[in-house]
């Protein structure tokens, strides 16, 4: 807070503590996630977080739990993606032995093998939607449906702007340094550009200006 760190990224991945234990990511479930996130807000730091769908052992309803987690924590920037089995990882080696990996080029199932898996990453590929390069234990269509529902829900204009407002109220900002004239000019130009785009979009126009006015009433620090 004294150094004025403003943003941090957290790889939450999934709100299911049992699934985190299975995937050997126990550190992510050491404390209740909502309390941990809100504690960070008390130090004036906003959070962006990564969430992943497609883990082995993932249960039906994971998408709903993910939406609830994002709403309760107030995380504004939620990067929701599909699991990618990367080369030279414990996960990929296991999936190769089980004969569950899919060839990126031919989209054909690879036979069980101890060979090193090769991942061909095409230019301009969206890393959040290009996952599931293996046979999932959960129904694949269900995972895609969960993904679509999570993204469309958390980025619904009304819900998103309401979450922004809740998080803004929790952020305990302390301005110790004043921006230079160059920095102020740059931020002012960015603000004008954002306002123009938001006003142009009828779906977000009212929500944006409502939030802007309410934030202005909280003071310049917000």
Identify the residue ranges that each predicted region occupies.
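A structural motif corresponding to the C-terminal lobe/cap of the Radical SAM core domain
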Residues: 1-187, 199
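Terminal low-complexity segments of carbohydrate-biosynthetic enzymes
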Residues: 175-222
